[in-house]
């Protein structure tokens, strides 16, 4: 089916709870299942999502929610059997959940500038977030999957099972997940976003993700047409795929496309300098560091 996008995720998927989407593979799936107040465009610019607009003032930022953003249907959850429109209290719950010690979200830090009790639903369509200090990068932090809006009744009813039974507003919804085997997402028929011609998104009917840890098998799947996409190619396969000028090898030009696009990524090198655990370590010497 040309409307099914297939790829392999060699690192696997450990959770579908956006509060724990700390790695790239988890972020990709969270972006398919959930929306936040704002999101990044393909050009890495902040654009509206669940929030149609916002304004800053001396206290922080006020978000105005768009109408018609629906949670995907959840037949086992009272109130979500036919889906439900997102309201401001859902935003408050989702963000405050990051601070819940029982959730233990690694994304709690995105709220470091937010006042305690400073996430407020002014009415069903307006959310105020008060900051402790002026912090313009805050909007950028809200584009991360950590800030995704979830359905409170689904989280509370499912408890720890929410990691495998998500409830969001994204372009796709979960159809099947067998850990270490495959994950399948189906098109969310109630998704709110449309393209410039008014056509409802997404264009795809489904996304199929395999979890094959061997990169050689993944590359073979790409060459044989079982996968539509591969990122982060191992150097061992570069000679087969590409020519000396960095383009596609002639034998692959009829079947594959090579695209180079901007990619938002941060790497760092950390040096452990705790003298309680590294007695005698050269890293304790600032001249070495």
Q: What spans do the regions from the language model cover?
A:
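N-terminal lobe/hinge region of extracytoplasmic solute-binding protein
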Residues: 8-58, 96, 165-167
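Short, low-complexity disordered leader/linker segments with a strong preference
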Residues: 1-2, 118
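Acidic glycine-/aspartate-rich tracts in secreted/extracellular proteins
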Residues: 13, 68-69, 134-135
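A structural "hinge/loop" feature
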Residues: 10-27, 50, 75-81, 137-147, ...
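Surface-exposed binding/hinge segments that line
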Residues: 55, 90, 103-152, 178
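Short, well-ordered beta-strand segments
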Residues: 5-10, 230
